[in-house]
Amino acid sequence: MNDTIAAVSTASGPGAIGIIRMSGPGALSISSSFLFSKNGFLSPSDIQPRIAIQCVFQIGDRKIDQILFFYFKTPNSYTGEDLCEFHFHGNPILLREALDAIFRAGARPAKQGEFSRRAFLNGKLDLTGVEAIGRLISARSRFELELAQKNVFGEVSRLTSNLRSQLISLKAECEAEIDFSTEDLTYESLEERKVRIEGVKTFCQTVIAKSNSAEKVIQQLRIVLYGEPNTGKSSLMNVLLGKDRSIISEIPGTTRDYISEEILLEGIPVRLVDTAGVRETEDHIERLGIERSEKEFQSADIRLFLIDVSKKEEWKKFIAKAKGRLEGSILVANKIDIRDSSWNPNLFSDVKDLIICEISCKTKEGIPILLDEIQKKAATMGHVEDYVLLEERQRYHFETIVRCLDKTLRLIEEGAPAEIYIQEMNYALSEIGEVNGRVDTEEVLGRIFSKFCIGK
């Protein structure tokens, strides 16, 4: 890394500010050849680290723009090298002209993710930190963003540090028993050792499970609208989306397959699913749609169970059949504006964890309350404190650690000497190192940094 790289680090297109970033041993000297103040061009000795300098970016005799310039001296910079930033007005033509001049002065174009690669290679970031930055940039929801922020500030590094500490303690106990076997010392029993190893394994499995749950939320929770025909599922779908997506008709069986759309609720991505109305039918196509409705209902993260409270016999008959399936759902009593006098929400007081919302899709009565209840349910599934976000590569290494610990336990059960099962602990420790980026090949680095933009 003896060369100097440069790139635009702000988004393409016009903007209030456009930033060119340059890193490497020649960054300061190249920069000074373009920085013009009232006393002439600045020399490197005129430029103090971490102090904003207002000056003119000038190419030869031609003034290009009034800019702010920042210099970060090695090693106290993002990349660990001398790093300079030019803050221009954000015109793409202007930035291109300035960047071309910087290239002519001796810098070369940065490759994808090269600034972060240099930060990693110079020890400014471990690999989990680099991956966290990539996730931070690409996050599609507030939930994903907050999980990425946790990792930027060292969540995965803390977990691996904790795990490493537990494993080293275990390994040290085993090695002490080997090295001082002739001494009159007391060591933990094999049963106690197995309990400790199981504890470390459980720690890993918990991290993996929390990550899998986080990915499920990131990939979208599914909110399924379920009920008999003409209870208002399609109308509610359109109301929640704020647009006409589902066809509405008085004819039963209009929706024959599920329809889905993505929305954001409190920063959490969810997918609304409008299903076919559930009823007895001889129509083969409609029956297939009803079967899909059942599958969607079973796999839903949040269930909206719709009933039409304007028709006494209809909703009472349906609830008699379906009351046992309401636990944990939101019962949406639709058409409350024309409800039958027999409607009584207290009929469901014995159903566990059931929320009842009375609404009218026609008048919009109760819709804000329903939305609030949906958001509350979604939020309970999206508390960032309850989750860990592992990248696919990191998850693989955690799963490998679990396999190493499983083999360690099996070897102990089989009566293998400590010298043998300690080797599995060494493999597990090696996997922890891989999580944080103690890697020997360029392949992993290339795969990670290929997802970054040029100026990062």
UniProtKB/Swiss-Prot annotation:
Family annotation (PROSITE patterns): G_TRME
Residue numbers binding K(+): N230, S249, I251, T254
SUPFAM superfamilies, alphabetized: P-loop containing nucleoside triphosphate hydrolases (SSF52540)
Domain annotation TrmE-type G: ranges: 220-379
Compartments (UniProt record): Cytoplasm
Residues where GTP binds: 230-235, 249-255, 274-277
Cofactor(s) for this UniProt protein: K(+)
Cofactor, how bound (note): Binds 1 potassium ion per subunit.
GO biological process, one term: tRNA methylation
GO cellular component: cytosol
Pfam families: MMR_HSR1, MnmE_helical, TrmE_N
GO molecular function: GTP binding; GTPase activity; metal ion binding
EC number per UniProt: 3.6.-.-
Family recorded in the similarity comment: Belongs to the TRAFAC class TrmE-Era-EngA-EngB-Septin-like GTPase superfamily. TrmE GTPase family.
Full protein name: tRNA modification GTPase MnmE
Source organism (scientific name): Leptospira borgpetersenii serovar Hardjo-bovis (strain JB197)
Gene: mnmE
